[in-house]
């Protein structure tokens, strides 16, 4: 009888995980924005100086942290080098340098010191989607978090970023960022 309940439990767990992944799949695709404007090309938008303001929310929507950021990008040899410096409201300072290679009109590959493997980017119309796993320090431990990042260009100066953060396929938070390109 114990074996029967064990197998039923396994079947229920597998069914739950399957249904969760089915209903949580992202049905929005970069190609959906093919004919939208203004067109975002990250190698142009992030070239030069950009300011950012953002907030981090937990899985329930509670704002847990906020930041301001200074960014500076250079585009050379088909690669955007984007230096980011974050100033968190709890006093933490953080730096990241992205190297994002433009593969073709729509596809990008990115790397950074705290990114696991390579980030995949897709640009269509006014939207840029970036998928990557980031090592995030949380309570003294380094945790791998998956980011599903969307940037939507609003005009020549403003872009809005919305990211879903996941661990083991489960949503653990959201990140909202407003970018302002500084005329250089």
Protein language model regions, located:
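Amphipathic hydrophobic-ligand
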Residues: 63-69, 142-147, 171-175
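Central antiparallel beta-sheet cores of small beta-barrel/beta-sandwich binding domains
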Residues: 53-138
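Short structured motifs
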Residues: 34-38, 68-69, 114-118, 146-148
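Amphipathic/hydrophobic helical signal segments and adjacent flexible N-terminal regions
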Residues: 1-47, 51-62, 184
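Glycine-rich, aromatic-bearing surface loops/beta-hairpins
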Residues: 153-184
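Surface-exposed interaction patches
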Residues: 120, 128-130, 146-150, 158-160
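Edge/loop elements at the starts and ends of beta-strands within beta-rich repeat scaffolds
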Residues: 43-48, 77-78, 154
């Amino acid at each position: 009888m114990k074996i029967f309940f064990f197998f039923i439990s396994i079947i229920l767990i597998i069914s739950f995980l399957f249904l969760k992944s089915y209903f949580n799949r992202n049905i929005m695709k970069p190609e959906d924005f093919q004919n939208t404007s203004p067109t975002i090309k990250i190698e142009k938008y992030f070239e030069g100086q950009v300011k950012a303001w953002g907030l981090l929310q937990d899985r329930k929507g509670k704002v847990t942290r906020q930041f301001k950021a200074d960014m500076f990008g250079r585009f050379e040899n088909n690669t955007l080098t984007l230096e980011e410096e974050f100033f968190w409201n709890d006093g933490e300072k953080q730096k990241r340098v992205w190297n994002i290679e433009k593969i073709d009109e729509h596809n990008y590959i990115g790397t950074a010191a705290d990114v696991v493997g390579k980030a995949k980017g897709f640009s269509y119309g006014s939207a840029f989607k970036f998928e990557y796993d980031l090592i995030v320090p949380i309570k003294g431990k380094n945790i791998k978090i998956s980011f599903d990042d969307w940037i939507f260009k609003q005009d020549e100066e403003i872009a809005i970023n919305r990211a879903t953060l996941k661990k083991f396929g489960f949503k653990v938070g959201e990140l909202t960022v407003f970018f302002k390109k500084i005329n250089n």
